[in-house]
Amino acid sequence: MHSRTVFFVSDGTGITAETFGNAILAQFEMKPRHVRLPFVDTVDKAHQAVRQINHCGEVEGKKPIVFTTLVNMEVLKTLQDGCQGMLLDMFGTFVHPLEQELGIKSHHRVGRFSDASHSKEYSDRIAAINFSLAHDDGQSHHDLAGADVILVGVSRSGKTPTSLYLAMQCGLKTANYPLIPEDFERRQLPPALEPHRKKIFGLTIQAERLAEIRNERRPNSRYASLDNCRAEIAGAEAMMRRSSIRWLSTTTKSIEEIATTILQELRPERLVY
């Protein structure tokens, strides 16, 4: 049973409100019900949002929490005047003080990604996603020279989600390559990766956690057995040490933490823009 309903109201996609709101909610031991209300860009839609929020409060007997990134003042005022939830206006909290500090007025432009599809950054991100999908799980060795990052590790150690995050969020062309027992027997990196060693970053994981993940995919198989997981991890870590590959354990880290560590180690310039 959720302890409270949280609404994310935006005149755009609602992703900014949801991301910011979830970062704040993560500080509290609770499991709220999430409701995203995107494209609330007219007064009529704001009235609909107010009715939905207030009805939720009446049914649950608790004030909903409402995070909003509305920039249209008329739409925002409609929400402020009618909403019976706890309203947290993110843009209002930060934009006005920044206007005063910078001495300039903000655009109050709806949708911060409104022109994104025509930007070089957007095109680069799409290219990075396509590259990462084409080079997922060692599918292709073609154009590894064009990779920004190459992730290596045993199967199910977190390579694919990290690759896609680096592509989507950072615009990095990221290949990932599984390390398998045949690689451990050779005691060296796969030949296709050797020329690109400076781009390689390794991911490892605790054997118990790996066995748990693999058992969800192939229950009671040798692939998922704890002994096999231990052997593969030991082989992969030994190889990375011999090859002087930087690596980290993904066991207790989020994708965001993993990706940020990789950026710090391999592409620190991407942290400054």
Curated annotation (Swiss-Prot):
Source superkingdom: Bacteria
Record field: transmembrane: none
Keyword tags: Kinase, Nucleotide-binding, Serine/threonine-protein kinase, Transferase
EC number: 2.7.11.33, 2.7.4.28
Chain positions recorded as ADP binding sites: G153, V154, S155, R156, S157, G158, K159, T160
UniProt GO molecular function: ADP binding; ATP binding; phosphotransferase activity, phosphate group as acceptor; protein serine/threonine kinase activity
Reactions mediated catalytically: [pyruvate, water dikinase] + ADP = [pyruvate, water dikinase]-phosphate + AMP + H(+); [pyruvate, water dikinase]-phosphate + phosphate + H(+) = [pyruvate, water dikinase] + diphosphate
Similarity section: Belongs to the pyruvate, phosphate/water dikinase regulatory protein family. PSRP subfamily.
Task performed by this protein: Bifunctional serine/threonine kinase and phosphorylase involved in the regulation of the phosphoenolpyruvate synthase (PEPS) by catalyzing its phosphorylation/dephosphorylation.
Protein name: Putative phosphoenolpyruvate synthase regulatory protein
Record lineage: Bacteria, Pseudomonadati, Pseudomonadota, Betaproteobacteria, Burkholderiales
